[in-house]
Amino acid sequence: MKIKVNGEEKKIELDQENALLSTALNYMGYKPNTVVVELNHLIINSMIWEKVKLKDGHNLEIVSIVGCG
């Protein structure tokens, strides 16, 4: 499946059954409690990432949260 992540096209090896947002984020190495995800211009609540299916051509913007003191 090909999706756009932060403006760059990426090929992710997930079949349609496992093409969940949570699975894709894990595959790409993101930690769920440290990112905010926008899918096709809508911010997706992390509580439903396991229910959101990705499709070819979807656009993800992923912002990592970094704490500093």
What kind of feature is each model-predicted range?
Residues 1-68:
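Ubiquitin-like/PB1-type beta-grasp interaction modules and other compact soluble beta-rich domains
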